[in-house]
UniProtKB/Swiss-Prot annotation:
Homodimer. Interacts with host TRIM25 (via coiled coil); this interaction specifically inhibits TRIM25 multimerization and TRIM25-mediated RIGI CARD ubiquitination. Interacts with human EIF2AK2/PKR, CPSF4, IVNS1ABP and PABPN1. One of its GO terms (biological process) is symbiont-mediated suppression of host PKR/eIFalpha signaling. A motif (Nuclear export signal) lies at residues 137-146. Residues 180-215 are annotated as: CPSF4-binding. Belongs to the influenza A viruses NS1 family. GO terms for cellular component: host cell cytoplasm; host cell nucleus. This is Non-structural protein 1. Inhibits post-transcriptional processing of cellular pre-mRNA, by binding and inhibiting two cellular proteins that are required for the 3'-end processing of cellular pre-mRNAs: the 30 kDa cleavage and polyadenylation specificity factor/CPSF4 and the poly(A)-binding protein 2/PABPN1. In turn, unprocessed 3' end pre-mRNAs accumulate in the host nucleus and are no longer exported to the cytoplasm. Cellular protein synthesis is thereby shut off very early after virus infection. It is found in: Host nucleus; Host cytoplasm. One of its GO terms (molecular function) is protein serine/threonine kinase inhibitor activity. Residues 1-73 are annotated as: RNA-binding and homodimerization. The gene is NS. It comes from Influenza A virus (strain A/Memphis/1/1971 H3N2). Upon interferon induction, ISGylated via host HERC5; this results in the impairment of NS1 interaction with RNA targets due to its inability to form homodimers and to interact with host EIF2AK2/PKR. SUPFAM superfamilies: Ns1 effector domain-like, S15/NS1 RNA-binding domain.
Length: 237
């Protein structure tokens, strides 16, 4: 096992512990708490994969951080903070929408890279909006926290979330997963739109019809889906 992988996990465990103390003292806002919950799942997955105990890793991570801070001068710390790009946290969903439990009548789940896609295949002929909470850096989507599909009535009918066991994903991973989710929902004659905020920071533009540009692979897949559906309709007639 690579030593850097282990030390990175140990430091992440300790930093999570510090952030938990901030929340316990009621000093964290909603996005801070949201990231804390997501990172907890990620750390559990990484710990299981690496075969490391989180509590023991936290103690070692504390020692690593204390050693670095002891060696770090105040001036160097100021320069590091000034040069580091700052990310922003954007929210399409409210805390209630983000944390609400939901159930699927006809569940379908698919893993697309480091992301998990869940769709309720029982939903038909609905207008659906995709909303997401995510971080942005350099005006581009950095990390997806959670994406959910909502009907006009407010019901959750689909979701994209990072896999705790596979931390880290790219903007292309997110766009591909959104394409899969849209295709799955449109299979049942649902009309799907993507929030303008998500369009802007994932695709760099926003369309009035709420549809992001599709990749050539997604276009070919949707064309095959449409042809298959036409054949089924003809057979039914």
């Amino acid at each position: 096992m690579d030593s850097n992988t282990v030390s990175s996990f140990q430091v992440d465990c300790f930093l999570w512990h510090v952030r938990k103390q901030v929340v316990d003292q009621e000093l964290g806002d909603a996005p801070f708490l949201d990231r804390l919950r997501r990172d907890q799942k990620s750390l559990r997955g990484r710990g299981s994969t690496l075969g490391l105990n989180i509590e023991a890793a936290t103690h070692v991570g504390k020692q690593i951080v204390e050693r670095i801070l002891k060696e770090e001068s105040d001036e160097a710390l100021k320069m590091t903070m000034a040069s580091a790009p700052a990310s922003r946290y954007l929210t399409d969903m409210t805390i209630e929408e983000l944390s609400r439990d939901w159930f699927m009548l006809m569940p379908k789940q698919k893993v697309e890279g480091p992301l998990c896609i869940r769709i309720d295949q029982a939903i038909m002929d609905k207008n659906i909006m995709l909303k997401a909470n995510f971080s942005v850096i350099f005006d581009r989507l950095e990390t997806l926290i959670l994406l959910r599909a909502f009907t006009e009535e407010g019901a959750i009918v689909g979701e994209i979330s990072p896999l705790p066991s596979l931390p880290g994903h790219t903007i292309e991973d997110v766009k591909n997963a959104i394409g899969v989710l849209i295709g799955g929902l449109e299979w049942n004659d649902n009309t799907v739109r993507v929030s303008k905020t998500l369009q802007r920071f994932a695709w760099g533009s926003s369309n009035e019809n709420g549809r992001p540009p599709l990749t050539p692979k997604q276009k070919r897949k949707m064309a095959r889906t449409a042809r298959s559906k036409v054949r089924r309709d003809k057979m039914a007639d």
